């Protein structure tokens, strides 16, 4: 808001002269001049451009004065271009309330640029205190930029010596030598050095204080007072702490206001509308914002102005009263932050006489103390090098705050932070003031630096850890550097060097991870997480970049990947350039659809960046603030490119690529902690798990990645491999598993805090976790279906939840109250030692832990000192971790922070969101999100040990959590954790102390006191690790002479007259003796109640951890199915259901039993099958059963058929058993001579003589049917092996012996061809076979074997004739061509067979050298008396004569005799063959059936052709038809599969008519070579 000015006149400051000692105002009217018309036009134009730049209460406009043109004039600081004249300005000469422009013109000076309308500043800039009521006719006062510039050009703030109720203004006449201080109430809270006060005391001695000072001081002054509380330690702000007295004004003094102390209090500035209130508020606001870095948002509510004018030193002579100093202190606060402005106008002396100063000049001795002291023995800050040093006189020429030499600004609310440069200090570790104190790990944060004084041409180098960047000088008090990119989080060294100087200005800069950094770019909806969003809307705070809202911005996209050992964060694309700084923008993904980022399309997540289009340049260094978003997936940008690269299912392809890559990486699941089963256990495991900021029930209950969850916890430190664990819990408090749903708990390959050395792949904080764990979750699950294969692989294989079956709750021990201790084994006792002691000590080669406590005496009560102590500080360290100390703050310093935390000796704070969790080497420290006042701190070590410190109402408790790996390893006041209370009182030397628990003195003297610490290392005890401040060592706290109260009950140690206290203790505490003891000792109800509360808390924790949760573990959810519930505790009944169009198979229900196991399943599996797949499985199962039943049955039938069909009739139709088949003709002759006749006799006994049949062989009967000889192929034996069908063992065979003895070559018989069987040929002339003697009788055989046989008969050979035919005339060669073919055959009618028999009137005897058909002819041994020859065999008695001639109707077909030995061998061979065929063919048939079934489903259109094909294949072949099957015949179904699995025939197969002359029926394949395929032989075959 503002007043529109149409005509503005330039205001010239009127030169005024103030006469010393007079209160009259002399107006100098001679210096007034008029303003030219050109000047008025120019000023009017300038005002029109800035007519809206008026300051309001809530949004003051920043104005940067030209501080480079400031000069000093008689102690006043003025702008050269705004002020003229050598005399002080007197604005009271101008009546600004007259609204008379013409009169103003007469009073204005030509050079002035100040524009004022309708305002009288005489009340502000004069000596009279103005009224605080409304001015300017009751309208709210509005300050202009010109007026603000004018009032800020003055060095000293306003103070008045006139006006007010008593007409003394701000002057404090009650302060003088006899009463050097005065009390003032604020009626508001003034934070100072950790404390907060609503009052102060103003001292004439150059300071204000808030607590009683000591009775006397010793110089040089030292604070805090080491002997506190025996000696008072004052809390004060010392601008010039030295004994003073009010001096006299010198004649040349330009300021006529009287010497002394001035005090003015301006309250509620934020709501004031009067002129003084508004101008005071705006002046202080901009002086602090521009003077102190990091205070850009400060807005004061109250100010205090204290001025010491013309103060002389105490102890001087009368003339020393004119040796005076003038200085001013301005305190501004919003009741959270407090700033102090020290204005040193004039310093002429430095020390008073008690400090050794000269009585005349105040020089020499110890100069004044300048600094701050918190009081109560806590902290102090001495402003070096000026305090108590000779360079104190330089205070008027140093500081340069707001461009004024002599102005020094400090921030003093919690810590003392210097806001101005310090030119005169030097050292190796000078404190560096910088803001902000933390920044995003990605870089780009502008860091303002204050500490050294800068010259415009200085070269500034800032080093962040190991990275150095160049800075730029802004002014003498400030330089800026841009934070580079980090690859780690936590605290980093921050150092500044000027020119060629070493890095001596040092500080610590906190690096925030991208996932936990303060969010600066916001996404109002979830569109950025989608694959194809229509738009992506972003917002940001427009004032985070610059206060100039007209500046142009640019938005860019960055991506991250890990394809090499080094992480890569790279620029991808510019989203938009020239964006207005409106705080919002909408991204249209369609604009980037045709982009081709070939080098970056493998980046799957990244960040949005917003910065200035045109960076500002300071000393050649471009400076532009940068805003980063949180990590976001880049599907909205790269989806079209990924679709072109991977297809429409790009998410599935990318998921598969990740799965393939992740399988090559090392498994990490065994390295992380096991999740607790319930949320209660997870919240009580302080050493291993901490809240997950992405799903926290207190601050972030949305749980984007864990829908249905209410709270998640994460492992507090990375594992030995750098991985982390996550455990999420549902509304019932049970662990959510990824086997049940994709929102379940998931471990991570990379921990969010990273892993040393951080700058390598898989070890970068936040970024590596997003790369390895978060983006795969998007690709496999969020961008696909939950039951997709990739998502289930992600959930079940790559990132599966660990069940809680093996979880073990930690052991807990604690200390609280006065103090009372509960050990790990639940032993309770009280120990009131005073000093520093060991609580827990573990000294193992792999596990090391030290937890120490400090006990200090309880504050006094109304009856005096209290002989009891309480816990005030705890320090802990583990292995190689940093040391963490948590200290109780003083009672009056707990208004903002209840506990102080020291990390490696430095204070750290958790007051901002990004600082809630801080990671240090080996240890993580965090403040729970629901805590805002730092009253609860949790320390987590990488070993799993945890320390929890809680404060309430000034009373502190500490609890230690240890995993089971520490069992039997602990020592100290918390005992030996062995589940046995008897060894808890173990001394450092390992001996057990005998302690009476009812006697506090016994535990104190015999056990606890042995664990006291000192500042030197002690064996089995260690060394004290506490932060030492102001020389307070362990000896300062240890008090072995302190004797506490050892009596347990208040009724026994309180005096009789305090029986009401005893009664009160019983009412408050009831059955808790710890509570009664604390109340009886301290009479503090808060302490007693919190003692009872802490005891209940640790008792409940122990009971909860001791409560074992029995878990049945993981029960997988079937794919395409669901479970009725996700519980896993005993008694849980889980029913399985399937999605629509799916059928459940297997177990439908499982029950968790009391033994922690799921009941035994009926089937062992549970599946949800599609209806089609279920039908296929049912069909396959049916076919499997059929095949399993039919195949053995068919095999059995085949075997039975073989036995029944080939076995001769039992009525005497069996042939001789030719057991030995010689290899050659010569061998046959040898066998005839050497075979035993006894063998023939045995054979004949087992044979049926055809001649003995009742029926005449002349006429065929049903018992002797005409049939073709079956297949009877004999395989030749292997070399050296004569065992086989017809071949006796080589070692036993007579033929073998004969062959060997005869010396004849052994001709290898081959049976792979077809042999003539002399079967009747079709259409051949009928031949009447003569009657023949079918075989020898048994008597004849017996006669042949009689001893009367002569030796000569050995040369004769007895043949075993064939059953149905006699061979006449020439003997027939046996051998390869004598083997019968595989099928019956006949010669063509009229063909001549040279081997065909000639039917004569009589039979011719068979020559002995010939072997008919099988050549199975034996030579039985013939007795020497026998002289019969083979030719006379059939003429022997008892043998019927052969018929004279054959019958007229001769037998056209005949049957070959079977051989029983051959039949047994053939049966075995056939059985083995069928077994092999079945074993091979059965799986092939099943596979072919499966393949055929699936092909049938895919190619239903070919079902008709398949049926036709099957019909053709099974019907008889028409001789007139010719079927040709080639590889190009498309009538064959499933041609594709056939060609893939079996080779196609090279030529067709034809059906040929038997009458065809080319049809070689009945003839052997004499022209075929081994291995050559034979022609088709009467059946339809497909080769």
From Swiss-Prot:
Subcellular location: Membrane; Cell junction, Septate junction; Lateral cell membrane
Region (Disordered): 1232-1448, 1521-1583
Membrane topology: Multi-pass membrane protein
Feature: compositional bias, Basic and acidic residues: 1291-1300, 1521-1539
Domain annotation Sushi: ranges: 1110-1170
Tissues of expression: In fifth instar larvae, expressed in midgut epithelial cells (at protein level).
All copies of domain NIDO, residue ranges: 260-415
Protein name (record): Protein mesh
Species per Swiss-Prot/TrEMBL record: Bombyx mori (Silk moth)
């Amino acid at each position: 808001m503002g007043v529109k000015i149409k005509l503005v006149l330039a205001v010239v400051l009127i030169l005024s002269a103030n006469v010393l000692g007079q209160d009259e105002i002399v107006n100098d009217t001679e210096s007034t001049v008029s303003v030219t018309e050109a000047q008025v036009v120019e000023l009017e134009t300038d005002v029109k451009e800035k007519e809206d730049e008026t300051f309001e209460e809530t949004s003051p406009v920043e104005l940067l004065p030209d501080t480079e043109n400031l000069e000093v004039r008689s102690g006043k600081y003025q702008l050269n271009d705004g002020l003229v004249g050598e005399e002080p300005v007197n604005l009271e000469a101008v009546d600004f309330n007259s609204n008379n422009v013409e009169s103003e013109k007469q009073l204005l000076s030509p050079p002035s640029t100040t524009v004022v309308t309708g305002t009288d500043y005489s009340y502000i800039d004069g000596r009279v205190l103005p009224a605080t009521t409304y001015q300017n006719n009751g309208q709210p006062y509005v300050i202009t930029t010109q007026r603000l510039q004018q009032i800020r050009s003055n060095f000293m703030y306003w103070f008045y010596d006139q006006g007010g109720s008593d007409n003394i203004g701000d002057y404090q006449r009650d302060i003088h030598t006899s009463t050097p201080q005065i009390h003032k109430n604020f009626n508001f809270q003034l934070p100072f050095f950790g404390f907060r006060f609503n009052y102060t005391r103003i001292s004439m001695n150059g300071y204000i204080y808030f607590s009683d000072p000591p009775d006397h001081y010793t110089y040089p002054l030292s604070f805090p007072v080491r002997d506190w509380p025996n000696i008072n330690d004052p809390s004060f702000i010392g601008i010039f702490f030295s004994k003073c007295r009010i001096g006299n004004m010198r004649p040349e003094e330009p300021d006529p206001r009287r010497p002394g102390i001035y005090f003015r209090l301006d309250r509620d500035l934020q709501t004031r509308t009067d002129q003084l209130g508004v101008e005071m508020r705006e002046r202080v606001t901009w002086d602090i914002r521009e003077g102190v870095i990091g205070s850009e948002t400060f807005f004061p509510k109250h100010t205090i102005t204290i001025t010491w004018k013309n103060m002389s030193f105490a102890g001087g002579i009368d003339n020393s009263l004119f040796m005076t100093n003038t200085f001013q202190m301005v305190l501004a606060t919003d009741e959270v932050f407090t700033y102090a402005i020290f204005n040193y106008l004039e310093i002429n002396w430095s020390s008073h006489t008690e400090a050794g100063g000269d009585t005349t000049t105040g020089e020499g001795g110890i100069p004044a103390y300048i600094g701050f002291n918190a009081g109560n023995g806590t902290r102090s800050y001495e402003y070096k090098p000026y305090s108590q040093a000779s360079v104190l006189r330089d205070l008027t020429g140093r500081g340069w705050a707001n461009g004024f030499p002599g102005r020094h600004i400090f921030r003093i609310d919690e810590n003392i932070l210097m806001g101005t440069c310090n030119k005169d200090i030097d050292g190796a570790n000078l404190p560096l003031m910088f803001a902000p104190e933390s920044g995003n790990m990605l870089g780009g944060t502008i860091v303002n630096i204050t500490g050294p004084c800068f010259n415009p041409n200085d070269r500034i180098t800032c080093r962040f850890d190991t990275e150095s960047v160049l800075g730029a000088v802004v002014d003498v008090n400030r330089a800026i550097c841009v934070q580079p990119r980090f690859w780690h989080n936590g605290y980093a060294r921050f150092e500044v060097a000027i020119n060629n100087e070493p890095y001596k200005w040092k500080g610590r800069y906190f690096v925030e991870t991208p996932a936990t950094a303060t969010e600066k770019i916001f996404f109002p909806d979830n569109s950025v997480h989608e694959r194809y969003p229509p738009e992506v809307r972003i917002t940001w705070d427009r004032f985070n970049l610059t206060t100039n809202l007209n500046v142009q911005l640019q938005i860019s996209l960055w991506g991250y990947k890990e394809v090499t050992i080094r992480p890569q964060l790279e620029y991808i694309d510019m989203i938009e350039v020239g964006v207005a700084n409106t705080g919002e923008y909408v991204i249209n993904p369609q604009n980037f659809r045709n982009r081709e980022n070939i080098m970056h399309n493998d980046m799957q997540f990244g960040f949005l960046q917003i910065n200035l289009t045109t960076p500002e340049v300071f000393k050649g260094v471009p400076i532009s603030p940068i805003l980063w978003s949180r990590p976001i997936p880049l599907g909205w940008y790269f989806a079209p490119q990924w679709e072109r690269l991977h297809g429409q299912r790009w998410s599935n392809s990318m998921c598969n690529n990740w799965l393939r890559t992740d399988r090559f990486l090392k498994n990490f699941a065994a390295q992380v902690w096991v999740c607790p089963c319930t949320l209660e256990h997870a919240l009580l495991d302080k050493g291993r798990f901490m809240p997950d900021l992405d799903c926290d029930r207190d601050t972030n209950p949305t749980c984007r990645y864990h829908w249905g969850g209410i709270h998640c916890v994460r492992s507090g430190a990375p594992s030995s491999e750098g991985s982390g664990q996550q455990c999420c819990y549902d509304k019932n408090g049970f662990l959510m598993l990824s086997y049940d749903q994709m929102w379940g708990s998931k471990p991570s390959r990379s921990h969010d805090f990273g892993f040393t050395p951080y700058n390598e792949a898989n070890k970068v904080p936040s970024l590596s976790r997003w790369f390895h764990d978060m983006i795969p979750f998007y690709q496999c699950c969020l961008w696909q279906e939950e039951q997709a294969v990739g998502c289930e692989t992600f959930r079940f294989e790559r990132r599966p939840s660990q069940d809680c079956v093996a979880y073990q709750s930690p052991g807990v021990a604690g200390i609280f109250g006065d103090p009372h201790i509960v050990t790990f084994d639940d032993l309770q006792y009280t120990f009131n030692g005073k000093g520093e002691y060991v609580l827990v000590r573990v000294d193992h080669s792999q596990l090391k832990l030290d937890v120490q406590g400090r006990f200090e005496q309880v504050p006094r009560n109304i009856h005096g000192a209290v002989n009891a102590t309480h816990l005030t500080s705890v320090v802990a360290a583990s292995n190689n971790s940093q040391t963490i100390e948590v200290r109780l703050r003083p009672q009056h310093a707990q208004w903002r922070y209840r506990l102080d935390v020291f990390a490696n000796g430095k204070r750290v704070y958790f007051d901002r969101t990004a600082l809630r969790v801080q990671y240090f080497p080996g240890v993580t420290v965090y403040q729970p999100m629901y805590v805002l006042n730092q009253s609860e701190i949790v320390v987590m070590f990488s070993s799993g040990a945890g320390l929890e410190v809680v404060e309430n109402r000034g009373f502190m408790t500490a609890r230690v959590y240890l995993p089971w790996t520490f069992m039997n390893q602990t020592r100290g006041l918390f005992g030996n954790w062995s589940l046995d209370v008897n060894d808890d009182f173990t001394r450092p030397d390992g001996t057990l102390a005998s302690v009476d628990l009812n006697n506090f003195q016994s535990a104190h003297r015999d056990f606890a006191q042995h664990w006291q610490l000192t500042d030197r290392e002690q064996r089995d005890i260690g060394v004290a690790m506490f932060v030492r401040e102001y020389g307070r060592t362990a000896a300062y706290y240890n008090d072995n002479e302190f004797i506490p109260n050892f009596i347990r009950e208040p009724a026994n140690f309180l005096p009789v007259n305090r029986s009401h206290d005893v009664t009160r203790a019983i009412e408050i505490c009831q059955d808790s003796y710890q509570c009664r003891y604390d109340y009886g000792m301290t009479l503090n109800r808060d302490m007693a109640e919190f003692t009872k509360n802490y005891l209940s808390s640790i008792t409940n924790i122990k009971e909860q951890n001791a409560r074992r949760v029995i878990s049945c573990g993981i029960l997988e959810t079937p794919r395409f199915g669901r479970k009725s519930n996700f519980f896993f505790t005993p008694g849980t009944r889980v029913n399985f259901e399937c999605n629509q169009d799916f059928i459940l198979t297997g177990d439908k229900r499982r029950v968790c039993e009391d033994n922690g196991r799921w009941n035994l399943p009926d089937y062992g599996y549970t599946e949800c099958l599609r209806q089609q797949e279920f039908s296929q499985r049912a069909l396959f199962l049916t076919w499997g059963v059929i095949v399993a039943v039919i195949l053995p049955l068919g095999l059995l039938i085949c075997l039975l058929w073989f036995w029944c069909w080939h076995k001769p009739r039992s009525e005497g139709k069996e042939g001789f058993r030719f057991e030995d088949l010689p290899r050659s003709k010569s061998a046959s002759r040898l066998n005839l001579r050497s075979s035993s006749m006894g063998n023939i006799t045995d054979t004949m006994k087992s044979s049926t003589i055809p001649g003995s049949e009742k029926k005449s062989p002349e006429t065929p009967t049903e018992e002797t049917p005409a049939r073709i000889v079956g297949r009877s192929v004999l395989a030749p034996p292997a070399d050296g092996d004569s065992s086989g069908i017809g071949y006796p063992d080589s070692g036993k065979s007579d033929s073998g012996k004969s062959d060997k003895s005869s010396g004849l070559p052994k001709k290898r018989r081959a049976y792979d061809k077809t042999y003539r069987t002399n079967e009747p040929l079709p259409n051949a002339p009928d031949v009447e076979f003569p009657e023949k003697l079918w075989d020898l009788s048994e008597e004849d055989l017996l006669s042949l074997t009689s001893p009367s046989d002569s030796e000569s008969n050995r040369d004769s050979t007895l043949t075993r004739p064939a059953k149905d035919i006699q061979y006449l005339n020439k003997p027939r060669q046996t051998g390869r061509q004598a083997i019968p073919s595989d099928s019956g055959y006949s010669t063509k009618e009229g063909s001549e067979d040279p081997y065909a028999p000639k039917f004569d009137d009589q039979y011719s005897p068979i020559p002995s050298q010939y072997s008919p058909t099988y050549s199975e002819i034996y030579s039985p041994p013939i007795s020497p008396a026998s002289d019969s020859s083979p030719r006379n065999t059939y003429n022997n008695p008892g043998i019927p004569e052969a018929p004279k001639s054959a019958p007229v109707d001769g037998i056209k077909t005949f049957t070959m005799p079977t051989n029983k030995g051959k039949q047994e061998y053939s049966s075995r061979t056939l059985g083995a063959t069928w077994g092999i065929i079945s074993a091979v063919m059965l799986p092939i048939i099943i596979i072919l059936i499966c393949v055929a079934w699936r092909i049938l489903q895919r190619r239903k259109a070919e079902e008709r052709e398949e049926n036709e094909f099957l019909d053709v294949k099974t019907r008889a072949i028409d001789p007139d038809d010719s079927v040709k099957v080639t590889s190009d015949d498309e009538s064959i179904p499933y041609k594709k599969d056939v060609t893939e699995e079996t080779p196609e025939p090279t030529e067709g197969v034809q059906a040929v008519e038997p009458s065809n002359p080319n049809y070689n029926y009945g003839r052997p394949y004499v022209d075929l070579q081994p291995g050559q395929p034979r022609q088709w032989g009467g059946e339809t075959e497909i080769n």
